[in-house]
């Protein structure tokens, strides 16, 4: 479906674009749509935007859009520097410039294709400006303090689902979503942020995870979905003892038939299954 009917019907959209050249083309189209249909208050947004320019940030602000950023550069920073140089990597993405322009900004992971789903790795990247390999990419003006980084992960993200005021903060009348952490995020050394974890997770007022001193509160795993999944009725879909170790190295040989196959023999003989995880 094109942007014109989406704007006409007041349906939000998101566009995935890493390079500014792509964002430029997308904004040209959105501006044409905006001449006939308002795109404000739709909560549309651009994902990624690592190389977006100040001009296009301002265009997004004028059109009422947002930007969702992810910590892909924490994993790909060295490769970006090798190709484009350290100077070009300093503002990938230009987070504080986005915030200064008044654009709604939310943080996530883009897992599991290009980054870990671990939020603490993302928060470490936002605060330190370093890759997981320790390469310093960002100057101080493109790094966030810990509170601001955490708010991008919580309160700010509610804008993108049109749920501002309903979730994202531990306050009355919002969803009771919270986590008790293994250590204090605000006081641990920078290099320990990525190692944090939740020992108690509450979602909608219900405990959904417990470990360490909260192990006794840890609920059983929910049954596999959908309810017709063969995992719920057939034991041969379960990993047998020892097979996990056997398949752990499977993706080192990507050619068809070169894996150590699992018991069912399905993913292995079709070639590399890295894409599935």
Regions from the PLM with identified roles:
Residues 1-92, 100, 106, 182, ...:
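Active-site core of metal-dependent hydrolases
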Residues 24-27, 31, 96-99, 120, ...:
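Predominant activation on well-ordered alpha-helical scaffold segments within soluble catalytic domains
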Residues 104, 111-277:
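Active-site microenvironment of metallo-dependent hydrolases
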């Amino acid at each position: 479906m094109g942007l014109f009917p989406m704007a006409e019907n007041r349906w939000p959209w998101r566009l995935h674009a890493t390079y500014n050249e792509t964002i430029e083309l997308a904004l040209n189209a959105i501006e044409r749509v905006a001449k006939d249909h308002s795109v404000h208050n739709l909560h549309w947004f651009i994902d990624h935007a690592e190389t977006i320019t100040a001009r296009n940030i301002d265009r997004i602000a004028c059109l009422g859009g947002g930007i969702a950023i992810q910590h892909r550069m924490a994993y790909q920073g060295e490769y970006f520097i090798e190709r484009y140089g350290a100077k070009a990597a300093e503002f990938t993405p230009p987070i504080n410039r986005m915030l200064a322009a008044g654009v709604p900004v939310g943080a996530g992971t883009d897992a599991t294709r290009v980054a870990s789903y671990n939020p603490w790795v993302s928060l470490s990247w936002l605060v330190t400006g370093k890759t997981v390999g320790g390469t310093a990419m960002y100057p101080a003006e493109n790094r966030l303090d810990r509170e601001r980084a955490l708010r991008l992960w919580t309160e700010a993200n509610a804008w993108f689902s049109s749920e501002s005021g309903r979730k994202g903060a531990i306050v009355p009348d919002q969803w009771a979503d919270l986590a008790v952490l293994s250590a204090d995020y605000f006081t641990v050394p920078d290099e320990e942020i990525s190692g944090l974890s939740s020992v108690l997770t509450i979602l909608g007022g219900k405990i959904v995870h417990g470990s360490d001193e909260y192990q006794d509160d840890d609920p059983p795993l929910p049954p596999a979905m959908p309810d017709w999944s063969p995992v719920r009725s057939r034991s041969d879909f379960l990993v047998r003892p020892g097979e996990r170790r056997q398949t752990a190295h499977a993706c080192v040989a990507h050619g068809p038939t070169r894996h150590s196959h699992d018991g069912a023999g399905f993913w292995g003989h079709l070639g590399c299954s890295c894409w599935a995880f």
